[in-house]
Each structure stands twice: as C-alpha cells, then as structure tokens.
C-alpha cells in the first residue's frame, strides 16, 4: 500500500507540473493551417480530457495520457475567412484567433534561406524597400513563423516563437526567399499561404539529417558531436533536433530547401545525403509515397576565395544528380543570380518566384510551359570544324541574347587544359556554337564551371542555364 501511495503521489506531482491546458508556439494566433488535411494539434494538461473546438466544425475530445494529448482536426477548403480554435480542459482554455486556412510550406536551409528581407552584413536584398512598404497589403494572405536558432542533442517538441502578420516592420525580419515564394503563390492561387521558416546560416547538411542515416554513411556521430572544434550547426542531426523536430508532422503541402554552400568539400556524397534527408523528412511527416514535393535551390555562384576554382559547380552537379534519386523533387537554377564577392545574392525575388513556378505546376495544376519552370540543361555536345556545337534542353523557343557573345564557356583540347571561349547562338534553335583561337581542335566544353564567372545565357522565358561539363 505504501508503494502504491508513493507511486500515486509521484504521478500526481508529475502531472501537476503541466498545470493548465497548453499548446506549443506552433499553434498560436495568426497561424495558417493546410487546407483539406488533418492537422494534429498537441499539448499538455493535467486533466483527463481536452477538447479542441474549431469554428468551422464539430469539437473533438481526446484523452490525456501522461499529461500529454493529441487531436486530429480536419480542415476545410482554403479561404480568406478568419477562424478561431478553442482548446480547453475542465478548468482552463486557450483561444487561437485570426487563423487562416490555406497552403503551408516548410522552408529550411542555411543563410540564403535564412537571410531576412532587410539584408545582412552590408549585403542587401534587391527591392526590399518596395516589398516591405507594401507588406501590409498581404496581412490576410501571408503568415510566417520563424523558429529561433537552436541546436539540440535530442529531438525537441517546443520552441519560442509566433506567427507574424506582414507589415513594413515584420516583413523586414522574414526570410526574403520564403517571403517572395509565398508572395508569388498567394498572387497566383488567390489563397492564404503560411510559411514555417527553420534555417541556420553556415549549416551543413549533416546537421539536418537523421543519425541513423549518417551512421550508415560511415559517420562516427558520437565522436563528431563531442568534438568542441566542430560547431553545432555542422554536427550530426543537431539542427534537425532543434529546428525541424518541433514542427515535425505539421500538415503542409511540401518543402523548400536552400542549402549546400557548407558542403563544397564533400560534393561526392551530397546527392546521397540529399536523398536520405528527403526520405527521412517525408517519413517523419508520415509521407511514405513521396506526395510532399521537395523543391530545392542550386547554390549561388560565388568566388569562395578562388573564382577559378570548381568546388561550387561540382556541388551543383551533385544537386542535379539528386533529382534522379529523389521522387517528386525539383531544382531551381540560380546561375544568373550569383555575385562574385557576396555569398548572399540580392536577387531573392527571382529565387522565390522560380520556386513558386515549380510549386504551381507540380502541386496546383497550373499549366506553365516547361521553359518557364525548369532551368536550361545541357543535352549534348558535338565537336567538328574547330568548334563545339552544344544542344540544350528546356529551350524550345530558343536562347538569348541573340547576336551577342555568350559568356561563361570554356574549351579544352586533348591536353585537357581549358581556355575561355566565345559562344554564339544558332538562330531559332536551342544550340550554341563555341570556339576559341586557343583551342583549334576542342574535345571538351564547359559552361559556368567555375566558382564564379560572368554568364549571360538564358532561354526566352528568362530561365538560366545550369553549369555543366561535357568531360565528366
């Protein structure tokens, strides 16, 4: 009896620590819920039951187990109607107000996804003044919650934060890439868009992966994570635990990812890492059939201490390779957005809009031509008469600029030494002829295959050309 009494007392103390009914910061005023889905609300309470009552439907009552509860709430079709949800137990209640039903996306990565609209460290975001000035127009169309930087040894459930409504003040602090992505989506779909932003500048992909996957790839996760010389943002699984686990399973349409600059030295394994990361994330969201699209962004060209180096384009190759490994994925081309001296290009609107174009066609049935959505890809190269004749994909309507030298090409002969070359577009064809007086008999051609080199080749709908090498 004494043991039973002691056990009951300890259990009572544990439950009393929870106190009144509570929900994580993810479930708060101004939030957006994914339309036509089941959103799993969760929280704590010291009572037997909790009721979740949405303004659009019947209340759902669930049992509390060990102080915790979960309730699946079905959401209606998207609209601009303002909703509320009441979460209550026998003694207390939480009101979640100004709630919208729309489209939700999880946006993650390193600094080019994290970079706020206001810019950072003397590096601006193009058009930020105009974008922020007009932000209040989208108060009922866009909402964003940004998770604070946090690393953790184990998966976390909660974080400090709140859903923000766009205004000239709040928009400046929002992820510029994610905001422009949301802006393009809400304009095209005429629906509310919610963004869950979870990024950390300078982070390596290993920090976002599962420990099991990393160990299978040969990582000694315990040694790496106990090494004080390795920053947490580069240690194994630390950022998944701190930034993704707290929103794990939150109903969303898909993912947008902008990362890779911190993995230039391990480009040979990056495609497999991407494949494993995406599979793990989808599994944690209960998506075993790859229904949630994974959209990701080519790292931007940047000199990286050596403009002539090839570390960046090799990582870009791995990003392209990952497309073949990852079902329902898409890659945004950024060859034309890079800046030689800044790793954070200002053209965040371009990146956000290109992400949106992929989402619109892939998720929402918007009929956009391939040339408007996909970056231009190398198809083949033929060598004859002292020149390379290069044919491209995703350029059905031709290439531009016509009649001007095309920058960014290089040719090599049998010696394997590459020299700058000039390209000329073959009129009305997705073909460029490339020649160089320094290479009378070329056997290999490259385009934009340096950490940074000026380029100017696009298709007629403005999509840039992915870096490539014919001698891979």
Task: List where the protein language model places each region.
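Sec-dependent N-terminal signal peptides
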Residues: 6-8
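Cell-envelope and extracellular/periplasmic
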Residues: 20-472
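Positively charged n-region of N-terminal signal peptides that target proteins for export
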Residues: 1-4
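Hydrophobic h-region of N-terminal signal peptides that target proteins for export
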Residues: 10-18
């Amino acid at each position: 009896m004494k043991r039973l009494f002691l056990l009951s007392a300890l259990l009572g103390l544990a439950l009393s620590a929870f106190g009144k009914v509570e929900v994580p910061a993810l479930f708060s005023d101004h939030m957006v819920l994914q339309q036509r889905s089941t959103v799993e609300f969760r929280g704590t309470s010291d009572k037997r039951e909790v009721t979740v009552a949405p303004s659009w439907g019947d209340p759902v009552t669930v049992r509390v187990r060990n102080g915790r509860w979960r309730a699946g709430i079905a959401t209606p079709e998207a609209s601009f109607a303002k909703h509320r949800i009441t979460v209550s137990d026998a003694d207390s209640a939480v009101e979640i107000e100004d709630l919208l039903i729309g489209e939700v996306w999880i946006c993650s990565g390193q600094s080019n996804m994290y970079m706020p609209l206001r810019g950072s460290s003397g590096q601006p975001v193009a058009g930020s003044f105009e974008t922020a000035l007009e932000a209040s127009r989208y108060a009922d169309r866009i909402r964003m919650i940004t998770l604070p930087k946090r690393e953790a040894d184990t998966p976390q459930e909660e974080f400090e934060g709140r859903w923000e409504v766009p205004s000239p003040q709040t928009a400046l602090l929002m992820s510029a890439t994610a905001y422009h992505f949301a802006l393009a989506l809400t304009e095209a779909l005429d629906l509310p868009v919610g963004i869950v932003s979870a990024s950390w500048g300078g982070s390596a992909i290993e920090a976002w992966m599962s420990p099991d996957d990393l160990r299978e790839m040969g990582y000694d996760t315990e040694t790496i994570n106990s090494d004080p010389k390795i920053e947490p943002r580069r240690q194994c699984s630390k950022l998944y635990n701190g930034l993704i686990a707290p929103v794990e399973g939150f109903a969303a349409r898909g993912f947008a990812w902008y990362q890779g600059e911190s993995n230039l030295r391990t480009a040979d394994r990056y495609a497999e890492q991407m494949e494993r990361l995406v599979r793990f994330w989808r599994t944690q969201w209960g998506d075993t059939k790859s229904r949630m699209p994974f959209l990701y962004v080519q790292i931007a060209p940047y000199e990286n201490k050596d403009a002539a180096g090839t570390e960046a384009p090799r990582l870009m190759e791995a990003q392209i390779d990952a497309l073949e490994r990852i079902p329902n994925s898409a890659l945004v081309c950024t060859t034309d957005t890079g800046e030689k001296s800044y790793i954070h290009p200002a053209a965040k609107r371009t990146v956000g809009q290109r992400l949106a174009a992929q989402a619109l066609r892939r998720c929402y049935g918007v009929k956009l031509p391939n040339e408007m959505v996909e970056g231009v890809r190398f198809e083949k190269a033929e060598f004859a008469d002292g020149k390379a004749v290069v044919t491209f994909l995703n350029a059905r309507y031709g290439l531009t600029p016509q009649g001007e030298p095309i920058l960014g090409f290089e040719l090599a002969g049998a010696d394997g030494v590459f020299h700058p070359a000039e390209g000329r577009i073959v009129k009305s064809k997705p073909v460029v002829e490339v020649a160089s007086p320094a290479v009378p008999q070329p056997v290999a051609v490259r385009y934009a295959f340096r950490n940074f080199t000026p380029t100017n080749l696009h298709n007629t709908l403005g999509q840039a050309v992915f870096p490539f090498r014919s001698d891979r």
